[in-house]
C-alpha cells in the first residue's frame, strides 16, 4: 500500500530543496498527500477496511499538523505548496 521508491524519489525531487531533502515540510506533506490519494482509491474497492481507514485518518491528521506548522512559519511557502498539490485550504 505504500508508494514505490521511484514515486517517492520523484516527489522528493519535485518538492525538495535538494536531491536528498526528504525531511522538509513540503516534501513530507507531498508524500502524505500521495499516500492519502492512493488509499482513497483503495477504499473505493474495499469499503469495510477499517484498519486501513484508521491509518488514513492518522495521515490526514499528520498532514494537517505539518500544514499548520508551515503556515505559521512561512506563509509564502504554504500558499505555493497548497496550490501545487491542489489542496483546498
UniProtKB/Swiss-Prot annotation:
One of the primary rRNA binding proteins, it binds directly to 16S rRNA where it helps nucleate assembly of the platform of the 30S subunit by binding and bridging several RNA helices of the 16S rRNA. This is Small ribosomal subunit protein uS15. GO terms for biological process: translation. The gene is rpsO. Keywords: Ribonucleoprotein, Ribosomal protein, RNA-binding, rRNA-binding. PROSITE patterns: RIBOSOMAL_S15. CDD domains: Ribosomal_S15p_S13e. GO terms for molecular function: rRNA binding; structural constituent of ribosome.
Amino acid at each position: 500500500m505504500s508508494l514505490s521508491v521511484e514515486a517517492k524519489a520523484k516527489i522528493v525531487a519535485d518538492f525538495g530543496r535538494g536531491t536528498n531533502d526528504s525531511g522538509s515540510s513540503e516534501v513530507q506533506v507531498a508524500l502524505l498527500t500521495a499516500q492519502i490519494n492512493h488509499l482513497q482509491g483503495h477504499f473505493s474497492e474495499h469499503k469495510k477496511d477499517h484498519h486501513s481507514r484508521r491509518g488514513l485518518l492518522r495521515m490526514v491528521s499528520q498532514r494537517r499538523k505539518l500544514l499548520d506548522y508551515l503556515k505559521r512559519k512561512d506563509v509564502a511557502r504554504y500558499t505555493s505548496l497548497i496550490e501545487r498539490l491542489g489542496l483546498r485550504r
